[in-house]
Amino acid sequence: RRGTVQHYFSGAVRVGNARAYKILIVAVLICATVLTMIVVNSLRFNPDPSRDQDFIARAQQKSVPGIKVKASALGGSESRRSFGENLGKYGIQPIWLEIENETDDQLVYLQIATDPDYYSPYEVSYRFHGIFSPAANLARDAFFLKRQIPSVVQPHSHSTGFVYGEADSGIKYARFVIVGSNRLETFDFALSVPGPAFVGTGVHADTIPRDQKVEDLDIDALRKVLTKISCCTTNSDATRLGDPLNLVIVEGERDPIIPFIARDWHLAQKLDIASIVETARAFIFRDEYLTSPVSPLFVFNRREDVAIQKARSTINERIHARLWLTPYTFQSRRIWIGQVSRDIGVRLTDQTWNLTTHKIGPDVDFDRSYLLQDLLMSGFVERYGFVGGVGAATMSDPRRNLTADPYYTDGLRLVAFLSNQTRTLGDIERLPWEQPPAPSDEAR
């Protein structure tokens, strides 16, 4: 019996030792994992601001007496390198900013005017905190805090730093509002963002063929010329008519894309392998794709110079516009002609390589009106009017675009003159040109 008891206790000891050994192994593994996480989290945070000059060099600059502002929006790889973390993963985009105050007054920069949903430095840093690495976390906090631009700029000094805003691609609209003693200054920027290729990020005067003369027009000549431009877009060899050219933009001093991106329009990506794959993914999963490519249309024997769109929550629905630079100017201001229509769904077709196409809404005047309202609400329009040139088409006898979608229209083109200063709705002039007719019984 004594041997049995000794055998029992020795067995229990062996079992206990085995359990203790397993617990020890687990504890060692946990400690090793925690240590690895600490090391990895510390090593991962490796910011490299040494190449910040890349985005500083392309900064845009605007000034008024006594105040100068420079700004640049960072692309994804620039942000990752400069801050040591993938901010784009969380939809965060830093904007580099420099404010020079040459006045005798203290100036205050209002970050909320740049982005109503801007992030605090601690909010950005905390997204990359490690559970077991307090020292690295403190270093991150200090780094992001130090790089935030101060809100106050003392007299005869300058401030530099970053605003942590929501991410955009292609072009980012940024408004900087600076307040002084009895003074308020607003600076609007359309900042280029490195990344995928977009339609319209590099449009300059040399878009017009060098052998084509640019004709400057007065207001009466402008009205006449705009009625004589072709009614519609075409295919690549100009043998078939497409969507109606129902839009004209006359530039002001600002970048003409600003009124659009200020109202949440986005540039369309160029049609390439990457955008095709992303389009397919968004179509399959019914996701939004704010910068999805558009099919090319042609005016002046070239495809659109700029393509912009405002998308809904699914890739199937969006309103989009294509714009072409014309060989005309108005008082030395460049003139664009374009078309605006609304995609209301997707359907099968034998007119495209992938056998599918967006279906446009047939009431293109509705979309023209929407765009006008958006431009008016932006505050960047000084006057507008309507001219002929498209030719009317009715609901009962519609015309068709290149993919055989029917559309009807009153035949008018919207002409919007962009302003050099923001204007209230009551200060915008309506030109006494053509007037859109009241809706007919057929359209009601």
Language model: regions and residue ranges:
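N-terminal Sec-pathway targeting helices
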Residues: G11-A32
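Surface-exposed edge beta-strand/loop patches
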Residues: M37-L43, D117, R147-R210
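Low-complexity, acidic Ser/Thr/Pro/Gly-rich terminal tails and inter-domain linkers that flank the onset
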Residues: D48-Y90
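Short, solvent-exposed beta-strand/turn "edge" segments of beta-rich domains on protein surfaces
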Residues: S79-W96, E102-Q106, V152-Q154, D237-A238
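The feature marks short-to-medium sequence segments in extracytoplasmic or secretory-pathway proteins
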Residues: E102-Q154
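Short, hydrophobic/aromatic beta-strand segments
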Residues: D105-A113, R175, I257-I261
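A cross-kingdom signal targeting lumenal/periplasmic-facing segments of multi-pass membrane
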Residues: S157, G170, L271-P439
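Terminal, regulation- and interaction-focused segments at domain boundaries
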Residues: I229-P259
